[in-house]
Amino acid sequence: MKFTKLSLAALIAMGIASNASALENVKVDGQVKLWYQTTDMTSLSTEAASATSKNDGIFKQVGAIGDLVAKLRATGDLTKKAGFGTTIYTATTLGLENNLVSSEAITVGATNETNGITNGDSNLPMWLGEAYMTYKAGKTIVKIGRQELDTPLAFTETWNAAPNTFEAAVVVNQDLPSTTLVGAYVSRGNGAQNTTVAKSFSAYGNVGGAYTPGETGAGAYAAGVVTTLIPMTTAQAWYYDVIDVANAFWLQADVKLPYGLGLGLQYAGANATGDVQNKTLAGVKDKDTDAFAVKLSGSVVGVNLAASYSTVSSGVIPVGNTATGFTKTKLYTATILSDGRIAAQPDVDSWKIEASTKLAGFNLGASYGSYDVKENKDGLRAFDVYGLNKSKNPSEIDLSVGTKVDDINLTAYYIMQNDYAAKTVGTTVESKDRQAFRVVASINF
């Protein structure tokens, strides 16, 4: 259900305006989402007797995380040319950490570090995920403020209980036929590695020695063009300057072929610059990372099929999301857990097959990804959270089923990841295999 009117008190509370009469076409919507995941790791320690270092069994508290997140969004027009948008999030564990989960699904503490609901910030955390103004002149739209972004190397991730967002100025122009031009400056973001989102917003870029984009720095610039001028093809080209982190580019073409076939091509590169290069790369020869990916897709008797391959050269910077410590990537070969943390890492070759269909009211999906991790001899895996090395050849199976029961959207995932992490040097700890079960339930209003 969507509302077209909003009370003055609510408008003031959401920081939209102090005079409701100036607003037109106000729409309010929202969502309540319950996010839960349990993980079972095998061979976490080579010492079988070390019970404290094992999570032996799925659905146990030690390997489970979860959150309940509510979202309230309002958009509207201030004038015929100016508009606004704002989104509030609030999160709680519902006390699940007492017996069902060990931590929350997202970071919602005072910073985008490891603080959160279960370790000190338990007063129903709230944050303003979006607060922006828009202005339209002809075929040009300017959007300034806190907002979601969707570009290949800086984007909002929606897989978790709440998305990360940015403080940015974006200009979009469509004067050219069948072509969209985009220019953006990103000053801050609340993305964080693995946990994706934090309450506070930190400066974008300048990872220094911490290897965590988003904590300090001078921001990032991006420019892109998306066009459908080439028949049956959507082509896009992007350039990024993440100050003191990297210069990067992304080229992609998705082609609709005869007989319902599709062909996708991706080529991207990232060159370490500034603090990353000067402070952390002494003696490193391969400072540039290049990636190439190809995907072939089609449909047979109502089943969507696809096969993809990617190769990432040796280097330093992963070809992934600069907003979340490269947690996710838009490379075709990414799977749920083997994403920016494996598929996009330097000196990794990947392939993936996938299938999806609709059956009796259910959305079914399955995929298998295989990853050949090589030495990266002349590069540096500065952004590697798994401890990848040439002795590891991870693989992953993802199964999903989604449906709607009354007003509740339900999606369940089963994830099996094998041989994904290296033995910790000087210890007996070795995270070899793991399986995970994730459930997401939501109600939109």
Outline where the language-model segments fall.
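Outer-membrane beta-barrel translocator domains and adjoining extracellular loop/strand segments
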Residues: 41-54, 58, 97-103, 153-161, ...
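Outer membrane beta-barrel transmembrane domains
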Residues: 196-200, 208, 219-227, 235-238, ...
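Outer-membrane pore/translocation modules
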Residues: 96-118, 188, 199-203, 314-316, ...
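Detector for outer-membrane/organellar transmembrane beta-barrel domains
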Residues: 228-232, 252-378
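Internal metal/ion-chelating core segments
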Residues: 172-173, 178-255
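Solvent-exposed loop/turn segments connecting transmembrane beta-strands
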Residues: 156, 160-163, 189, 215-217, ...
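Beta-barrel outer-membrane channel/assembly domains of diderm bacteria
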Residues: 2-149, 169-179, 227-228, 254-257, ...
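Transmembrane beta-strand segments that form the barrel wall of outer-membrane beta-barrel proteins
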Residues: 34, 142-156, 181-187, 223, ...
